Amino acid sequence: RCLCWLNRLLYLAVDNEILRTNPVENVEYEKKTAPKHKYVTREEMKRILAMPLNEGRAELGRRAFIFSYFTGLAYADIKQLHPCHIGTTAEGRRFIRISRKKTGVEAFIPLHPIAEQILSLYNTTDMHSPVFPLPSRDSIWHEIREIGVILGRHDDLSYHQARHGFGVLLISESVSIESIAKMLSLIHISEPTRH
């Protein structure tokens, strides 16, 4: 790892004409492989769908997590989702149009029937209140972590993994990369191919 950084710095020195050549250019070193993105699989989602939780906050966290999986929205975006972000096309299909909190890029997401079913349980009329009455991310994180433990996952389950799961789901259904980028409000169109 250190040799990799040293090599980059030396190439910068060569580019800025501080050095004539890179003295470690031909030195062999092990290159780190790119980390594999973790995501929620279809099988895991089927198990999550089949395990309603009794406690109110835990069930709210589970439903918001499922909603994240079927919309690709991050926790911060679900928390700021208001009824005004939900619309209907001329053909009668419902969708979400919202600017992502992280990037400010607008997402246009047709609603999956399971996401619509979850929406019907929460606020879709009061424009001044969010759709989901979510607590802070830290308090809901414990509920999501417990779901991961029940699933037998060795890593902590996260909303980001649900978002990646949505991307993988779309890719497996042969949705175009351009459409996926628009739904996930990605800045670079090459991002979905990393999944």
Tell where the protein language model's regions lie, with residue ranges.
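Basic, Lys/Arg- and aromatic-enriched nucleic-acid-binding interface segment
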Residues: 2, 15, 19-75, 79, ...
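Short, cationic motifs built from Arg/Lys/His that form the positively charged side of catalytic pockets
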Residues: 7, 60, 74, 107, ...
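Basic, Lys/Arg-rich DNA-contacting stretches centered on the C-terminal catalytic core
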Residues: 30-35, 51-52, 56, 76, ...
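C-terminal catalytic core of tyrosine-transesterase DNA break-rejoin enzymes
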Residues: 15, 66, 70, 76-77, ...
